[in-house]
Amino acid sequence: MSQKDIYNKYSNQSADDQQEEDDDENQESSCQLSPEKDLGESLQGEDLDEDQGVIGEDDEEQEESYDEEDEEEDDEENNQDQQNNSESNLQYDKTNQKNQQTEMTDNQNEFLAEDYLSQIKTNEKSELKYQLDIQSNLSGENVQDMDEKLKQYIELNGKNENQQAAESKKIENDEIMKKSEENVHEKVVDNNQKLNIQQNNINDYQEDIKKDQSNNLVDIQQNNEIIKEVNSEDQQQKNEMDNKQSDIVLAQEESKQSEQVEAPIVKQKKIELRPKVIYDPKNDVDQYTGDYSDSGESDEEANNEDDDEDEDDESENESRSRKNKAQLLKKKNNKKEQAKKQQVKKVYKKQTLVLNVADTKYPVVKFVGKKIFKWKLAYDMESMDFDIFWTDNAVQPEQLGRMQPYQKINHFPGMFSLARKNHLARNLMKMRKQFPDQYKFFPQTWLLPAEYNDFKNQFEKSRSQQKIFIVKPEASCQGRGIFLTRSLDDLNPSDHYVVQRYLNKPYLIDGLKFDFRLYVLLAGCDPLRIYLYYEGLTRFATEKYQEVNRDNIEDMCMHLTNYAINKDNPNFKFNKDKEKMDVGHKRSLTSVLQLLEDQGHDVNKLWKDIKRVLIKTIISAQPTLAHHYKSCQPDNFMNNMCFEILGFDIILDSHLKPWVLEVNHTPSFSTDTPLDSYIKKNTIRDSLKLMNCTCKAKNEIINQRKEIMQKRVLTGKKVKYTPEEKLEEIKKAQQKRDEYEDKHLGGFERIFPMEDDEDDNFTEYMQYALKCYEEQTGANIRRNTKKVTEDPKKITNQPKKLNQPKDLEKIYNTKIGAKLPPRKPNSQTTINKGIPGQNGQRPSSSQLNEEGETIQCEDQEQNKDEAIENAITRSASGRMHDFRIKKQNSPYNIHQKFKNKIQNRVAIGVKELKLAEEPFQFEENINGKPSNPNVKKIQAYITSEKEQLEIKNMNILQDQNYNSSRAVQAKKPQIEPQVLFVQEPQTKKLQILNQAKPPQQKLQFQLIDNTAAQMEEERRQWLIQAQRNLQYQLSQQQYQPQQKLTLLPKGPPIHPQTNVMQSIADIPNSSNSKEILAAVGGAISGQYKTDKRVTIKQKGQIQNQSINQLKDNNGLFLQPKLFEIQSFQSSQQQQAQQAIQSSLDQNLIGINQNMVGLNDLFVSGKSHKVQPHYQAQQDSYSYQKHNSYSNYYQK
């Protein structure tokens, strides 16, 4: 059944019930008239004439006419009601019920009128009472009609004599009236019951309608889905039909071409594929199901069957081929249709945002997200699948760096600069020194223990007038650890505290101290966007305020207004009604401002002062916030990934001047009172609205990122903006934010950027805050810019010099983006030029020329910025002169580059070249700093000197028969040992080394030379004593002839090789002289290997080795069995061991590079240069002790 049918059903039932009630009432009225009529006849008596009967008949006719009129009126009213009900259809509200009740009361009044008319007609003498009753029970219109009828009746009768009789029967009529009233009451009760029944029926009717509506909605949805499916199928069929027709046309064209070639005279037959057409009256469009009926006949065949009989065979073949093609197309289309049907339709859910509340403990946050915004809540701390992340803790930069551009978090990294008391005090005190009048809203503060001495002076200055200080921990909340003091003895100089002057004259309300908790929304840090919520909290102390004295200095409930401290006081009054915000010890901000205004204070001026104080406080930390934000999200032009609700604590002094006490980056959102829940819930809701946390904004950001990625894929380059383009993009983004935020402010007011900032120059404050931040972090140090001469043509005309360090410098500058001043090339010492300098003196900065031989210092020409930079570099590097070595120009990089060249040459068969420096000096250097680069510069000169010495030594060692000169000396009965462990340094080589040193190493090398000379003298004395001991032993032993050694025409002598890598501490107890001699050589080398005895290699092994491969013995060749050596006595052996061990412990062996070992120093024919070792701790070039002292010798 439809809604209309159900409604008509109930309306017809109600109309039938009303008709039945009217009939019953008419019957009752007729029953009541008969006794009244008899009563009237009895009252009239026998004196009445016959005319009265005629009059009675007229009355009956009138009554019948009245009854008919009343019935017609009732019928008309019912018809009208039905019409109204049919027009309204579904108006079954309470208004219909009230109308029905009024209709029932009208009908009751009409029924009463009919009853009284019948009574009054029988009782002609009760006219006055009848009129009174009519006026009391009928409406005004019916009374007038009845009065006219009565007048007519009285004129016809003309009898007033019966009035006396009517008065006599007044009591009887009263009884009749009571009975009629009782009957009417019963009828009213019955009508009420019927009304209740009708109301129940109406409720059932409403429920049925709701059910029908829900069923209809389901049916409509199903119908819509069916229609969509049908339309999709129709479109698929159309597409298939079009494709098939196009295939048929192509087939026909191909057949035409083939027929024209073979038999051009024969006419082609037209064959059509006629799909089964299904007529749709709604769309009136031809549709097909995919079934084809191919007759193979055309119009030409029907008209010319007799003439074209020869063409039937060819047409049949063509039709068969076309049928086959059509069947193949059908199979393909059927497969596609089946594949489409098998695909599951994706049901797209309504997009909602995800709020991560895993790191918050406040239920009000979850309520706002779940109930107000209908968001999905997430409780996984490590998950990155969220849109808004709400946390109660500080945010690290790494977390912000991992976020996507559409995600948001409720904290800024680097907010410690405002939230920590020590950082806030440091920033505000710096600003106060520069702007003393503008930043005088923060109490004077000292940071202990750094400023303990300054704070101590405050007590010495104010001995006569003792001042009160409030002491706070650096990082605490809820008033923990705060106390007041007058004495310095209460403080420990080593503890970390923030000490402030106590405001001893605050503004009081009801004798209580109070402060404001203001909620400030920081919506962006670069540029700043600050909003202030119109409502806040006012927190009162619970004890009456008095000036600080010895008795109340420890009463924190008097001096502190923190809720966590005062809520446990028995005097604390909770506000249990949010509508009464001016009651208790926690009130609303607006109620207190209204109270101040009622007291006659200028609240508008106070509110402006508070806003300026908030802006200046945030500006002091703006550079820190901007740096952290940009480093994590450099391409976020909207500046909307972070937001933070800050809790500012503001106190008023006796002059209504606002003072900043502290800033809370995680204000409490606990809802202990209805006032808390009302204010904090609205604050969170409006802040999330203001930050545009919507699906629309999220999708816009995602689409923008997709466009950027598409451009990058197409162009193959990353989209880079110039500084001007970045400023334009930022300006556009901020304008877009302004348009949205101005429409969705809610309870917030934008206080920065301000429109009327004429009084305060905020840009000047921000510039100075940036300057303070750069000085604190060292970001203001700029690199020296290139000096450009007045005539740029001179630079272009100059020939280009090939200078490897300079080219490396250019590469370094391009990598780091810095610009260094042009640097003169280092000094280059060659053999032809000789020794740099004059008369062996080291060149000074004034003697250096501009041709690239030495380094030029320009201390006098540097400006202020350059001087600062040089001072910082000197302090950082620890060097004594302004001398910088490029990283690319370091010896290590040069060594590696040369080594790579050698490897490349070896790969193509070129003879391998080896560097003189040992690899351990770079690989085992923990500090990673290179050796002295100037040693490489004098390598050629030293090599030439070594070659000359080598030739001299070779002439001494060789004779005409290529025998060793030591064999001639062995024939003598007594010979002196020719094994020398030390050779005096050559003066010429010392001059070369001293003059090749750079000027910045002057003092270091002087110290090294002095210590080396001292160590050399001690070593000489020890070795002389060792030689004497050997001579004494030789004098006591028999003589043994020396083995003959043969020398090749070129290169080192061929003889058994003795390895001298054994420590003197492990000298074996043996009578063999070669072991003792080799042990002494092992003491020089300072390195100990696994074999405790001297290893002797064979001649074949030494012949196969090249000069550069002799590294294990460092080119040191000892000839064994030159003479017989007896073993030491035990006492002498112990003394020798102790002496050598002490020299090893004191690092007296192998330190000086000028010390050369043995007479056979250059026997190997190859020079190994001495490489100094760099020590980072001393930050200078020095020679470091190593396991292998022999690596510092030139063998």
UniProtKB/Swiss-Prot annotation:
Keywords assigned by UniProt, alphabetized: ATP-binding, Cell projection, Cilium, Coiled coil, Cytoplasm, Cytoskeleton, Ligase, Microtubule, Nucleotide-binding
Pfam families: TTL
Region feature Disordered, mapped onto this chain: 1-110, 281-343, 783-862
GO cellular component terms given for this protein: ciliary basal body; cytoplasm; microtubule
EC numbers, comma separated: 6.-.-.-
GO molecular function, one term: ATP binding
Residues annotated to bind ATP: 500-503, 513, 515
InterPro entries per record: TTL/TTLL_fam
Annotated coiled-coil segments of the chain: 59-103, 144-260
Compositional bias of kind Polar residues: 90-110, 825-849
Function per UniProt: Probable tubulin polyglutamylase with a strong preference for beta-tubulin.
Name assigned to this protein: Probable beta-tubulin polyglutamylase
Organism of derivation: Tetrahymena thermophila (strain SB210)
Phylogenetic lineage: Eukaryota, Sar, Alveolata, Ciliophora, Intramacronucleata
Gene it is expressed from: Ttll6a
